[in-house]
């Protein structure tokens, strides 16, 4: 089929997107713990009666304040309990998609009885770490996830070790389709998007379907901070213009509202995050509708957005003090700019302006307020595109922005990888003090 006509670099790009753009039900950090609990429960014959769990500081940060779908409750304990009692260990990031009302009730009862404990893993050298140990009578099972939200590295029961992943991280990185991102460029990504056969990337339209449905749900309900529906009301009151800029803001916010507020609809994630997937998708969809783009043009714009976002995020830690909605919005800026005029220079200028604008936004854990940051990032992306269309951008004479967009990206990512590590520790310390 078309695969035989695609050069190896392009095939790697496609595999990278398929690896990083996946459906996910619920915020992915608590879902990672839910998956560990579900996988552990699957090793037992009896009903789970008690759960002990341990997570990394970053996973604790991103799990403390977010609503778990279908429960109306926030936090890691309910995620662990529902994963153990109603999760599907084979469903990955959609582990809770088939959880029944009875499972939700049983999970809440387990919490009320004080039978769920979630603790910090100390010491912990892994940014993303979740471990769930579940008990049934005299039997127990323990599952550990490290490095990626679904990467199970060890399964152990009271009868012995069932599975352990060999410590071959370097070999895995070498074989990963993401490895190509360390020696490519935005120009090569744009060349791929312009020329790859449509059938090879048609799958990315699922991102528009899933995240578009979340956006509609967010506008219908009072999810989270209901930013999208609130701003829509202000349009009706004449306080906001009903224009393209506002549509980007409202529809993107609404999807994140529903996502963070616990709607039982999956998001198409990017780089392990539903909000990043929403940010890379919805602004591009709105502009595509505005310009009357057909499915092929929308797919190419979405592929550019998602792959650019992955390319930038690949240079970051999986979780950090930098709000990655900003880097996902840089992908959206690329996709929107491509839809308007398709020039590389416009795309590069838009991303440079984004780095000069929202690069200092911190991640202080997953919560309803993520929708605020998603809306800010989406608006900044469109502003940067409008400037670039007039050949205006933040230049290499200003701040951390360099004369070359690739160096600008590297400068931003170096902040997250180095100096913002202390920021992350301070954020976690502040959040932990609130929990006591």
From Swiss-Prot:
Pfam families: SDH_alpha. GO terms for molecular function: L-cysteine desulfhydrase activity. One of its GO terms (biological process) is L-cysteine catabolic process to pyruvate. It comes from the Bacteria. Belongs to the UPF0597 family. This is UPF0597 protein YhaM.
């Amino acid at each position: 089929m078309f695969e035989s006509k695609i050069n190896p670099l392009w095939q790697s790009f496609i595999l990278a997107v398929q690896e990083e753009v996946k459906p996910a039900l619920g915020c992915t950090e608590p879902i990672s713990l839910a998956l560990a609990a579900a996988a552990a429960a699957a090793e037992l014959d009896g009903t789970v009666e008690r759960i002990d769990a341990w997570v990394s500081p970053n996973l604790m940060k991103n799990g403390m304040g977010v609503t778990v779908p279908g429960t109306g409750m926030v936090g890691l304990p309910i995620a662990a309990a529902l994963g153990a009692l109603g999760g599907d260990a084979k469903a990955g990031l959609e582990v809770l998609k088939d959880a029944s009302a009875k499972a939700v009730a049983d999970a809440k009862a387990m919490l009320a009885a004080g039978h769920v404990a979630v603790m910090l893993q100390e010491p912990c050298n892994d940014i993303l770490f979740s471990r769930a140990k579940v008990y049934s009578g005299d039997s127990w099972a323990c599952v550990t996830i490290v490095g990626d939200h679904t990467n199970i590295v060890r399964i152990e029961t009271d009868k012995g070790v069932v599975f352990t992943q060999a410590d071959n991280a370097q070999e895995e990185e070498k074989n990963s389709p993401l490895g190509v991102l360390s020696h490519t460029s935005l120009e090569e990504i744009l060349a791929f998007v312009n020329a790859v056969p449509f059938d090879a990337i048609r799958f990315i339209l699922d991102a528009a379907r899933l995240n578009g449905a979340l956006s509609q749900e967010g506008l219908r309900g009072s999810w989270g901070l209901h930013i999208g529906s609130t701003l829509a009301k202000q349009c009706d009151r004449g306080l906001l213009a009903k224009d393209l800029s506002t549509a980007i803001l409202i529809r993107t916010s609404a999807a994140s509202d529903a996502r963070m507020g616990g709607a039982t609809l999956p998001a198409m994630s990017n780089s392990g995050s539903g909000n990043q997937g929403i940010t890379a998708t919805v602004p591009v969809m709105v502009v595509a509708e505005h310009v009357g783009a057909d499915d092929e043009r929308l797919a190419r714009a979405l592929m550019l957005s998602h792959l650019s976002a992955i390319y930038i995020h690949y240079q970051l830690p999986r979780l950090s003090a930098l709000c990655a909605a900003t880097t996902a919005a840089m992908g959206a800026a690329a996709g929107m700019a491509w839809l308007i005029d398709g020039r590389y220079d416009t795309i590069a200028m838009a991303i440079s302006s984004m780095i000069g604008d929202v690069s200092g936004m911190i991640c202080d854990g997953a919560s309803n307020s993520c929708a605020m940051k998603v809306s800010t990032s989406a608006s900044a992306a469109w502003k940067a595109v409008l400037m670039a269309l007039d050949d205006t951008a933040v230049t290499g004479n200003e701040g951390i922005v360099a004369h070359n967009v690739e160096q600008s990206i590297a400068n931003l990512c170096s902040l997250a990888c180095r100096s913002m590590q202390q920021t992350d520790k301070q954020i976690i310390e502040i959040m932990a003090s609130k929990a006591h």
